[in-house]
């Protein structure tokens, strides 16, 4: 009997030891967190969005799907619909709820469209376990982070916490740089168009404001020019009206997805090619193979709210990442925006690596992100000001030549 008691005691000790070891192992098992992208995967932006997701996948592979002590899982959300062929308000609203409901998700890379961000950000801001962070590679509307339209940006942050960040600069700088460049090309009169959406109206307004400051003659009425209807079959009547005013340039504020191809075709058909009457667009027309394939796009000027890939440093992470992407996918990234998606994800991973893995702590760590230029996929350091904006105000000017975006110059707006 005594012998059996000893056996039982020994068994108990072993069981307790195994329990302690098992508990310790369970506590030290790596935690998996989810990061996501929220992009339009259908319609005109599909190629660019696919390229952005590919950049992120490659970046995650290079860091072995780790951020500090955490394993990282990547989830892709689609904020577009097949019916609309672009981002959709209702889909953006649904995605916002899905981000919050996904218990392992701690941060969102996106969105591409500023209007979609204005729907999602307030929902993430009010997440009881957050706020949840969103870092955009492409939103350029100023109102997300600074005073622009009435109530902006306060209405996007009901809790008072700024959970939104972006790695590209804003349209107040883009519009100013575009107008300055237009003047340098001898433009004295301009007709401004916008796509009637958040982004298009914002950049058209910024261009118009700067053009007026530069004493250019703005022939269009209103602070953001004239809106075009994306559902129109053609725009010949619009350009026939404009032709009578004899403008030196047409400035098109908007995105290519909204029937931009037809707009460009009819501009050239009625007003002549882009040497006769100049044409300029913002970054909502960059990165679209269908736009570059148009004969009517030749000679069009473009602006981009950051550095074009051509302007990335020829050393460091920016250079090596371009080589790695080409090797992995057999072609270069579709757009600079795609690579800035990688920069946005680098910021997110840095914050996660220094956090305790909760949404709230990832948010708190975002404020101190500081990735040196040599380690950045875009070749400039990744840092944010108090509003959540990048500290850089670089605008790249490009021209379409032989179906390719060709870099002309960089303008740094003060």
Residues of each region from the PLM?
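Solvent-exposed loop/turn segments at secondary-structure junctions
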Residues: 41-44, 79-83, 113-118, 139-144, ...
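Extracellular/periplasmic periplasmic-binding protein-like sensory domains
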Residues: 151, 264-342, 405-412
């Amino acid at each position: 009997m005594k012998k059996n008691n000893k056996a039982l005691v020994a068994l108990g000790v072993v069981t307790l030891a195994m329990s302690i070891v098992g508990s310790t192992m369970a506590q030290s098992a790596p935690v998996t967190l989810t990061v996501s992208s929220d992009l339009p995967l259908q319609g005109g932006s599909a190629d660019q969005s696919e390229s952005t997701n590919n950049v992120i996948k490659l970046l995650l592979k290079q860091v072995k799907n780790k951020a500090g002590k955490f394993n990282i899982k990547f989830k892709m959300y689609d904020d577009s619909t097949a019916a609309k062929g672009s981002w959709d308000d209702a889909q953006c609203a649904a995605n916002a709820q899905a981000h919050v409901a996904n218990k392992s998700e701690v941060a969102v890379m996106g969105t591409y469209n500023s209007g979609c961000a204005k729907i999602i950000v307030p929902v993430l801001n009010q997440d009881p376990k957050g706020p949840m962070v969103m870092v955009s590679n492409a939103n350029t509307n100023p109102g997300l982070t600074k005073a622009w339209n009435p109530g902006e940006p306060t209405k996007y942050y009901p809790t008072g916490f700024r959970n939104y960040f972006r790695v590209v600069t804003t349209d107040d700088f883009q519009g100013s740089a575009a107008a300055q460049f237009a003047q340098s090309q001898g433009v004295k009169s301009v007709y401004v168009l916008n796509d009637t959406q958040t982004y298009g109206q914002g950049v058209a307004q910024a261009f118009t404001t700067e053009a007026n400051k530069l004493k250019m003659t703005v022939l269009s009425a209103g602070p953001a020019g004239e809106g075009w209807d994306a559902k129109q079959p053609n725009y010949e009547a619009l350009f026939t009206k404009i032709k009578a005013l004899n403008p030196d340039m047409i400035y098109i504020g908007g995105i290519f997805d909204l029937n931009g191809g037809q707009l460009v075709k009819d501009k050239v058909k009625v007003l002549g090619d882009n040497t006769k009457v100049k044409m300029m667009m913002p970054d909502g027309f960059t990165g679209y193979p269908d736009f570059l394939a148009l004969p009517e796009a030749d000679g069009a000027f473009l602006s981009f709210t950051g550095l074009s890939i051509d302007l990335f440093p020829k050393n460091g992470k920016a250079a090596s990442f371009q080589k790695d992407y080409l090797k992995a996918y057999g072609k270069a990234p579709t757009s600079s925006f795609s690579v800035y998606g990688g920069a946005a994800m680098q910021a997110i991973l840095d914050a996660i690596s220094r956090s305790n893995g909760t949404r709230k702590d990832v948010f708190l760590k975002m404020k101190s992100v500081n990735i040196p230029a040599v380690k950045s996929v875009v070749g400039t350091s990744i840092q944010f000001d108090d509003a959540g904006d990048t500290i850089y105000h670089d605008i790249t000017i490009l021209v379409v030549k032989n179906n390719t975006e060709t870099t002309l110059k960089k303008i740094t707006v003060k």
